[in-house]
Amino acid sequence: MPKRTDIQKIMVIGSGPIIIGQAAEFDYAGTQACLSLKEEGYEVVLVNSNPATIMTDKEIADKVYIEPITLEFVTRILRKEGPDALLPTLGGQTGLNMAMELSKNGILDELGVELLGTKLSAIDQAEDRDLFKQLMEELEQPIPESEIVNTVEEAVAFAATIGYPVIVRPAFTLGGTGGGMCANEKELREITENGLKLSPVTQCLIERSIAGFKEIEYEVMRDSADNALVVCNMENFDPVGIHTGDSIVFAPAQTMSDYENQMLRDASLSIIRALKIEGGCNVQLALDPNSFKYYVIEVNPRVSRSSALASKATGYPIAKLAAKIAVGLTLDEVINPVTGSTYAMFEPALDYVVAKIPRFPFDKFEKGERRLGTQMKATGEVMAIGRNIEESLLKACRSLEIGVHHNEIPELAAVSDDALIEKVVKAQDDRLFYVSEAIRRGYTPEEIAELTKIDIFYLDKLLHIFEIEQELGAHPQDLEVLKTAKLNGFSDRKIAELWGTTDDKVRQLRLENKIVPVYKMVDTCAAEFDSETPYFYSTYGWENESIRSDKESVLVLGSGPIRIGQGVEFDYATVHSVKAIQAAGYEAIIMNSNPETVSTDFSVSDKLYFEPLTFEDVMNVIDLEQPKGVIVQFGGQTAINLAEPLAKAGVTILGTQVADLDRAEDRDLFEQALKELDIPQPPGQTATNEEEAALAARKIGFPVLVRPSYVLGGRAMEIVENEEDLRSYMRTAVKASPDHPVLVDSYIVGQECEVDAISDGKNVLIPGIMEHIERAGVHSGDSMAVYPPQTLSQKVQETIADYTKRLAIGLHCLGMMNIQFVIKDEKVYVIEVNPRASRTVPFLSKVTNIPMAQVATKLILGQSLSELGYQNGLYPESTRVHIKAPVFSFTKLAKVDSLLGPEMKSTGEVMGSDATLEKALYKAFEASYLHLPTFGNVVFTIADDAKEEALNLARRFQNIGYGILATEGTAAFFASHGLQAQPVGKIGDDDKDIPSFVRKGRIQAIINTVGTKRTADEDGEQIRRSAIEHGVPLFTALDTANAMLKVLESRSFVTEAI
């Protein structure tokens, strides 16, 4: 069927900010879909609140609205644009829920907007647990016994009839939010209560637990002519019971018989046909390992995390084709862009194995609950491709960037047998490493399979890896054993360890004996047809398929998996850098390991290497491609950390040189540079042990800010008030980087701001200054940033511009740099300099219309700012006000404290733009799901050093009609200054404490600060947790509360008697 001509204008809803459960895979899907629709000649209107994505670039759609994805704003845009149709299946759960809301409020009918891709009835059938159950019964597809409940009592009654364990699944939530496994009534009551609150329709499904079954997923496509196919099947290494987003996954599935595969394939295709989905869909099934029994677990009637993985694993571009199907094209009319010759109706065939391992945030959240269950906790993931399980698994392990280069964590050797087995049975994020350690200790695959329900097939592979380790240990320098190890994915580093030599020597031995990897193409058809995709993975074998071209090339290193502190912003910069390299006439080569992102879409670069970002793997590509040089500025700390070893190996680093990177990152060299340039910084010293740190702090005076050098996202950074706290920090936190010292700085409480600058070595372009709303002490990634600055004097802005120019030229910066300043009493101090692209690049690029990463890349490749038409100095300000606000994923992470400080905790960001500060703030708060009603109750629980300031806020809240509640000490302070606040009880005073008020819905906002001492106040933590769990806006910085008040004041009317 040809494409539809009765629709011209299509609106696409994006997925909003990155949170756990909804990450960069939707940026990738949305970008593909918008371009795909434009290619077919439709006018595309995009709504998305996330500035950090490629998707919200001007070129991606005809009109891009970076506005909150709320009923109010989306309706406004629909009325203004009047599209013929809406495509909601590419914006994750956010997009689907928005479509449902628009429909239920009658907006779609009123404006005559048609839903494309998935009909509302199908969204309802897949997402509403009751309708889903009915549909499965009609199709005679087995599902676990279950009951829909709307109250806790109903749940308890049903569980009593089927017996424990049971699983709770809230309706219409993302990434299993609010769900979980319950072994008894107490757990069931707790989880159901929370799940009902988090479900927008207060509905949960209670079902019999089938934990221990194999979890299998099918990624399927269907078109309007009822053609349907399986793109890819995938098998979870972890059995049912752990969220698939937190599971290690292999594609294609490895342990099913042909009969089982056909059975589950038929089930998946019959489900997508029954739902009449036009586009992509993901079906999750549970298979009994001991019989042919299976159950359908759930269906996602949209593009999902698994479809991004399936696209990258097969090369089959699901989102791109889903968009074409949505406008009426059929699978037998669309050419598969990978081969360029076969139609999309061909099912992909794989002649390799793909492994995906999730990346968790627990290196940042040491207190977080690491046990895995049905609620997702990973922030990102890595993927690796190999010719066997061992190879793809070990490549994926070293892609994780958690300090491992093999499937082992050396520290586990010291763990007792009992502790080890407990971790093997009770899965945490690092279970793979515990299971591998158990095998090294002689536990058999059979014993471990019994304990974990992991298939023996995979455990045998882990045993095989261990056997190769033993072979290597017994035969140092043996070439045959070396070949075997390389065929099975071993790194040079691991081999060197077992041989008692260095990585370099192993590399030399390999090169002398021509033991080098070949690169194979990902072509969707197992090499049956000729293919034109330049998408490669390494393996040790025969016939290299990646042929070096005659054109000069430039290699760009990506940023690896998404984690807190290094998010999709770096992928954004990578993609823009590639565009500039191509525009300059070079061949652009990308190397990255993250399946969710736009940079690993094979159509972005001239060549894509899907490989771990380690020195060995990068050098292998360089040896083959011989590029003009490597760009490391855009891949965050991942790429910067590779600069020095690459330069030592004789590789040309393009842009700022390694010695100059060192001057910005090494404390003593940086201090010296600032002295020479006559730029003030807070007084500080370096310390390599506890005594030195104590001495330094006494000299500088408390409070001090302590942190390791060379880290990203404020890892292990703290503000300490006294020597005792400092000593305990030195004992517990300094593991962060053993061969780098700790920095001890005077902590200046002032106004913080940051600048991104671009330099060609002679001139410096400063696109803009961003002012932080929260004062110094809150990590820049967790602060709200305002552009242009609202409170900085002209003099301060001129000083900042002057210091920025001096630093860029003085540090020989070529390309991008980011500088953070703190201002106190009109004096400007430099806090830190990062000689690379930072996380503010996408935001600042969008609000100034300067494609910063592209400009920086052109300068790196030899052009000057004046040739590109840019002046030296500060770029003219925009007239609108733009705000970048952080978004957190605390609902997903039990036991993580939501108190903000110098260590970064946010997972994503949104942007609000308007003519005034108040309007822009309103949009930013709405987009980040912080909705405050115009009246209600606010509770204050404030540390002594901030009571004075809080009093002023409380008065303003009272003026606009809010009721004021406060904890005992705060209420007494308010009363002594003439403000009566209703006192609330201490934690544990039943019915009178803050958590119980929160549960009853009597509190609309909580303002909670702790002293600079920041001791773990358990009461405060419980209060903050209750706010997170019940979705009550929580402010742990008074500056943020002040910003929210500005919004409320601008929206409220004053009523006064005459």
Swiss-Prot record:
UniProt entry keywords in alphabetical sequence: Amino-acid biosynthesis, Arginine biosynthesis, ATP-binding, Ligase, Magnesium, Manganese, Metal-binding, Nucleotide-binding, Pyrimidine biosynthesis, Repeat
Positions that bind Mn(2+) 3: Q820, E832
Region described as Oligomerization domain: spans on this chain: 402-546
GO biological process annotation, one example: glutamine metabolic process
Residue ranges of every copy of the ATP-grasp domain listed in the record: 133-327, 671-861
UniProt: Mg(2+) 2 binding residues: E298, N300
Residues binding Mn(2+) 2, per UniProt: E298, N300
Protein's recorded name: Carbamoyl phosphate synthase large chain
